[in-house]
């Protein structure tokens, strides 16, 4: 489905509007009015560009300032740094070995049963936590 308009003028008429005998020239004023939106859009783009450049420069300066090493006096003055020292790798616990250890306790009946570590979740609970996003959320309300 196509639609087209075809305008033809008779030979004795002109394309300028009839003004009742007065001739007015709207050429320059119309051209200026048509150019205002593009000038405003250009000004807004330039302002946005300058804003982005300024933000990027300020964030780069902030990163460079935070990357510089601390002076000893700054460490003493800052409670955040002095109270939270980095832990050395020797103090970290190896959690892989804890899964392999098995502790058995003799019950009163004489049978041996594995002891449940109440500070460590069971393997089934860890599996459930790892797959929480598969379970749909159902409400009973």
Curated annotation (Swiss-Prot):
Signal peptide: none annotated. It is found in: Cell membrane. The keyword Membrane applies. GO terms for biological process: regulation of oligodendrocyte differentiation. Residues 1-29 are extracellular. Central nervous system-specific myelin protein that increase myelin genes expression during oligodendrocyte differentiation. Promotes oligodendrocyte terminal differentiation. This is Opalin. It comes from Pongo abelii (Sumatran orangutan). The lineage of its organism: Eukaryota, Metazoa, Chordata, Craniata, Vertebrata.
